[in-house]
């Protein structure tokens, strides 16, 4: 079997590795001179392909964005600068000797499908034949340019966020950004203290979430857990949104700052930024309404306000596309592509896509688990359902996204990290059984349930399991703390540490007494009432008790977390 991988970025590298683990003849084509994809920073905006900004720092922590059998160095910062991410990808590629399978500076011009194979036409004129093909070119290649009324009057510069690299050339300029996604906020923060003014124009507004959560911990180590997922599933949708909106409102009043959207918190892809509130409050950034029209050197908003503008940066996302593919191989309509589990084309299961997904979480572990699944299917160790079943699953997923998210073409490839990882892991056979682990090692089972759902979890069992997975999981709290512990505080060193502290902060006895009484009384009422009252009354009491218990656990999640782990 001969497999072609297109792209040697964060999705291409684990795809190569998955292939060589099963002895597959794999060739990867990379159009740039190095691995890394977006993370391979190329400051020349005319260079081929997309790339990060000079100041880009990831929005997911290192433990949550690691490949499942290759933890990053423990002393690296939790939120890594893009240079660290690129270094990590190089370390991964070197460790598993992946670079020798990559043909650099080689552009795939065209891919055609003939019977049971693919012909890959290269820019240099060569044509290579492959049995299978894995597309790893992502969804940040083709910028989406909006239609703007009256833009012909504007005499300033217009550019897309895709072309932004650094602050050079923006000094002393009036900059307006159209859009309020993560890229828009990163650029606004980057320019805030060197530009004359920075204005963010938003049509809908957004909920702003912080990377650094309670106690200074990375948010994803606290909230991307099986426990949290379970809580969000059992409590009503409205209550779940109220809970998260209350959290973000504590940091910044979204009404006062002009940010509150019409949609609920879970109806959008998270917008993550820790600096925005301070910069708005300090006058470095303005939040404005949607753009209505333009003057020569101004933008005029729909509420009538106008802002000076020398440079307009459109932060309006990207179009999904595969310009090198025949349209009959894989169609893209309305920024949607029909892929089973966002991976396999029902029309041609010899073609698979890795990384064509927008997770609430990191793309790296998701790309890796997709690659593992693909290779097992290619090797006929796993089978796919019928074409009709795959199409039905795709339609179900589309309806779920439309029900949950506000109507936008950017919400066509959304998934929740834990749920999606579990879904694919179940297909592979690498999802751990917590009930089995509970009887063997209750403490470790609790760690898997309450602790961060790190990628190493999916190497405990199943194909290509990793012997170091359990140790890596156990020491995640320590690895999160190590880069922060540059100085030991004298009083803290005298505190007694133990297992209790790992999950609970210093507990007020008054607080414990109060809650203990509530539980005791509630349980007593439920038990003593028995069936002496009506069945309906009894079940109402039971329901009330468990609702109280659930909210108690939710409150625990707010108050007690990993922040005291050594």
Task: Pin down the residues of each PLM region.
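Short, basic/glycine-rich phosphate-binding loops at helix/coil junctions
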Residues: 63-71
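Post-kinase regulatory C-tail/linker adjacent to protein kinase catalytic domains
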Residues: 389-397
């Amino acid at each position: 079997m001969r497999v072609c991988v297109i792209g040697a970025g964060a999705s291409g590298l684990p795809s190569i590795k998955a292939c060589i683990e099963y002895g597959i003849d794999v060739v990867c084509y990379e159009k740039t001179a190095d691995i890394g994809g977006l993370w391979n920073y190329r400051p020349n905006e005319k260079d081929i392909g997309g790339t990060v900004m000079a100041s880009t720092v990831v929005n997911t922590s290192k433990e949550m964005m690691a490949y499942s059998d290759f933890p990053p160095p423990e002393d690296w910062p939790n939120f890594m600068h893009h240079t660290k991410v690129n270094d990590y990808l190089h370390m991964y590629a070197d460790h598993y000797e992946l670079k020798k399978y990559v043909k650099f500076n080689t552009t795939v011009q065209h891919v055609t499908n003939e019977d049971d194979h693919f012909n890959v036409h290269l820019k240099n004129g060569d044509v290579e034949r492959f049995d299978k093909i894995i597309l790893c070119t992502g969804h940040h290649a083709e910028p989406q340019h909006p239609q703007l009324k009256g833009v012909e009057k504007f005499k300033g510069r217009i550019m897309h966020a895709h072309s932004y690299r650094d602050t050079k050339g923006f000094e002393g300029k009036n900059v307006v950004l159209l859009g309020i996604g993560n890229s828009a906020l990163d650029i606004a923060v980057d320019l805030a203290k060197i530009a004359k003014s920075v204005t963010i124009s938003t049509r809908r507004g957004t909920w702003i979430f912080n990377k650094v959560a309670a106690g200074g911990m990375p948010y994803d180590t606290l909230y991307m857990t099986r426990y949290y997922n379970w809580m969000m599933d059992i409590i009503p949708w409205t209550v779940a949104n109220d809970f998260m909106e209350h959290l973000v409102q504590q940091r910044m009043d979204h009404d006062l700052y002009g940010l509150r959207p019409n949609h609920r918190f879970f109806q959008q892809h998270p917008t993550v930024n820790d600096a925005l509130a301070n910069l708005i409050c300090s006058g470095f950034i303005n939040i404005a309404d949607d753009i209505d029209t333009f003057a020569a050197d101004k933008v005029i908003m729909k509420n009538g306000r106008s802002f000076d503008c020398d440079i307009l940066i459109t932060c309006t996302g990207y179009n999904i596309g595969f310009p090198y593919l025949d349209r009959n191989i894989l169609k893209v309509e309305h920024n949607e592509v029909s892929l089973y589990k966002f991976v396999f084309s029902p029309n041609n299961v010899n073609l698979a896509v890795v990384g064509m997904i927008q997770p609430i979480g990191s793309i790296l572990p998701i790309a890796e688990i997709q690659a593992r699944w693909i290779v097992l299917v290619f090797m006929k160790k796993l089978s796919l359902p019928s074409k009709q079943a795959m199409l039905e699953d795709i339609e179900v997923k589309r309806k779920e996204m439309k029900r949950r998210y506000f109507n936008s073409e950017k919400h066509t490839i959304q998934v929740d990290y834990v749920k999606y990882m579990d879904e694919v892991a179940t297909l592979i056979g690498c999802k751990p059984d917590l009930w089995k682990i509970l009887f063997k090692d209750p403490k470790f089972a609790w760690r898997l349930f309450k602790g961060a759902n790190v990628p190493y979890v999916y190497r405990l069992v199943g194909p290509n399991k990793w012997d170091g997975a359990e140790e890596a999981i156990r020491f995640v709290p320590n690895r999160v703390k190590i880069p922060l512990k540059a100085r030991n505080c004298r009083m803290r060193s005298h505190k007694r540490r133990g297992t209790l502290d790992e999950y609970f902060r210093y507990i007020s006895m008054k607080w414990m007494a109060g809650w203990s009484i509530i539980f005791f009384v509630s349980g007593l009422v439920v038990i003593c009432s028995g069936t002496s009252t009506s069945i309906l009354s009894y079940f109402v009491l039971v329901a009330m008790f468990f609702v109280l218990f659930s909210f108690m656990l939710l409150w625990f999640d707010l108050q007690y977390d990993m922040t005291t782990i050594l």
